[in-house]
Amino acid sequence: MAPKRRPVPLIIAPTGEGQSTNIDAASEANLEALQRKLGELDLDEQQRKRLEAFLTQKAQVGELKDEDFDPICELGAGNGGVVHKVRHKPSRLVMARKLIHLEIKPAIRNQIIRELQVLHECNSPYIVGFYGAFYSDGEISICMEHMDGGSLDQVLKEARRIPEEILGKVSIAVLRGLVYLREKHQIMHRDVKPSNILVNSRGEIKLCDFGVSGQLIDSMANSFVGTRSYMSPERLQGTHYSVQSDVWSMGLSLVELAIGRFPIPPPDAKELEAIFGRPVLDKGGAEGHSMSPRQRPPGRPVSGHGMDSRPAMAIFELLDYIVNEPPPKLPHGVFTTDFEEFVMKCLMKNPADRADLKMLMGHTFIKRAEVEEVDFAGWMCKTMGLPQPSTPTHSAE
């Protein structure tokens, strides 16, 4: 990891003239506690200023109510909910509002809202900012910082493949986000995938949709059938799983972003040549990529942006493949050996053999990516057709 910097004191600026605030002695104490917590984080000057700005804006928001939002557009759907870009009228802030429809008893609903309050304490440059959660008309609303670049699955659709040097920066942010959640809050993400990694025109990369509310996870499991394709083999088998499961999901996501399609079943030599524009050899010198000892299934992955024209693989075939077949890997000779090895360590089927967060943070691929000069914001804005720079909260419509 980067050398430790001296913690920079956090100053929350007072709210502007005419803004109503509810800052009493209790919330003053909360701000002091927040300053102490942020002081413990390894923030550079820019990260500190951005967190300060977000928290200053958040202090002006007050209690969130359904009637205070004007819809702007729909950002996407997934994880049992629809996400809208909205304007919060009292503060004029642009936010992302996720609506989750749940048929649940009031006691369960109140427990979910209570459990979501933990998100107020999740303040990190690698975690999407949280404004608050509330219940209205049969729906739970989770209001978050708006990330104007969208999610990495949306970026992938535009880019077709994401370059290794960009994925180096993504890997650093995801790892630091997972380390923060584990060390500061003792929680694991549980749902790492490209659609839960968000980016913005300032070049920030942040995790969202992690499992802070056990009750919400349970309620959604009863209501929705989500994609299970990023789950680790041990989790699919119903055995005990830990943060090592998040490591698997990150590795699988990186392969998808690097080759341009969900990597199960693996692309054959013909598809790899179509993807990379040249023959791709395996380590033995022969064309091809599949490590599977048995015949490759006839279906293609459930989702992806590749050139595979076979009928879709049924979800049960996909889950069987993840549990019983060799793990995906990066095609040899297209990427650096550091990146190949990093992904391989993430995708060991036995969680005991899989690299942990600390090992991955010290890996050569990450160490190289930390010192590499990469204009992530420039690449992102060019790919997504965004002006640069702009702020995620007051972004242009």
Swiss-Prot record:
| The encoding gene | map2k2
The record, for CDD domains, names: PKc_MEK2 (cd06649)
Region annotation (Disordered) maps to: 1-21, 284-306
| Catalytic residues, chain numbering | 191
Its recorded name reads Dual specificity mitogen-activated protein kinase kinase 2
Q: What is its EC number?
A: 2.7.12.2
Q: Gene3D superfamilies, from UniProt?
A: Phosphorylase Kinase, domain 1 (3.30.200.20), Transferase(Phosphotransferase) domain 1 (1.10.510.10)
Report the SUPFAM superfamilies cross-referenced here.
Protein kinase-like (PK-like) (SSF56112)
Regarding how it is modified after translation, the entry says: Phosphorylation on Ser/Thr by MAP kinase kinase kinases (RAF) positively regulates the kinase activity.
Q: Where are the transmembrane segments?
A: none
- From which organism does this entry originate? Cyprinus carpio (Common carp)
List the lineage, top down. Answer: Eukaryota, Metazoa, Chordata, Craniata, Vertebrata
Domain of life from the UniProt record: Eukaryota
Q: Which UniProt keywords apply?
A: ATP-binding, Kinase, Nucleotide-binding, Phosphoprotein, Serine/threonine-protein kinase, Transferase, Tyrosine-protein kinase
